[in-house]
């Protein structure tokens, strides 16, 4: 199983899904589901240089062509696609840290099925977004931060924050 993760830099809100592979099809499906789930407008997305996101290292020019399936999906959704510099994972540090937390959970548990893994990840995601305060957010949870942002800058949002999966206070 492969985990795709998106984190809003301003509020630390997380969206994630597991897939059977790291294909272009999986990455574009993830992008479309992210766009549908996110309460805020998505202007820019930052990804690593995996072949599911870019042709940067498979094209002869060694630069992205802009014609990769993921680039075209971003374009169709009005999202600007940025790539991390090669061999510089700290650029995407929020996702790297979150993935470390997920690795800890996965490595401490034996799952009887993929469905059980998905259920555990879904429960953790809900807990993370709704209940875990973040120091960078002045000890608010990501959902609390989203609600604050929405009250101050409603033009950045496409739907109500309280329609998120999990607990709603």
Identify the function of each model-found stretch.
Residues 2, 16-44:
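Active-site beta-loop-alpha junctions of metal-dependent nucleic acid enzymes
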Residues 6, 12, 30-31, 45-48, ...:
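Mobile genetic element proteins and their domesticated derivatives, centered on retroelements
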Residues 21, 59-61, 114:
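A generic secondary-structure micro-motif detector
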Residues 23, 27, 66, 91, ...:
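Hydrophobic (often cysteine-bearing) scaffold residues that line and stabilize catalytic clefts
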Residues 38-62, 85-87, 92, 138-143:
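Acidic/histidine-rich, metal-coordinating catalytic segments
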Residues 57-59, 95-96, 149-151:
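Short aromatic-enriched loop/helix-cap "lid" or pocket-rim segments at secondary-structure transitions
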Residues 60-91, 95:
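Helix-centered, glycine/charged polyanion-binding patches within enzymatic domains
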Residues 72, 77-79, 100-169:
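C-terminal domain-tail junction helix/linker
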């Amino acid at each position: 199983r492969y985990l795709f993760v998106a984190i809003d830099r301003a509020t630390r809100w997380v969206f994630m899904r597991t897939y059977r592979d790291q294909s272009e099809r999986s990455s574009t499906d993830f992008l479309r589901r992210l766009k549908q789930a996110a309460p805020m407008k998505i202007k820019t997305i930052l990804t690593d240089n995996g072949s599911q996101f870019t042709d940067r290292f498979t094209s002869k020019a060694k630069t992205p062509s802009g014609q990769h399936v993921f680039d075209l999906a971003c374009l169709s959704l009005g999202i600007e696609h940025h790539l991390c510099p090669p061999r510089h994972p700290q650029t995407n540090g929020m996702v790297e840290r979150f993935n470390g937390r997920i690795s800890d959970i996965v490595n401490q548990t034996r799952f009887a099925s993929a469905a059980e893994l998905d259920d555990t990840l879904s429960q953790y995601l809900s807990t993370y977004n709704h209940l875990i305060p973040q120091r960078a957010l002045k000890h608010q949870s990501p959902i609390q931060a989203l609600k604050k942002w929405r009250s101050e800058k409603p033009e950045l949002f496409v739907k109500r924050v309280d329609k998120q999966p999990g607990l709603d206070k």
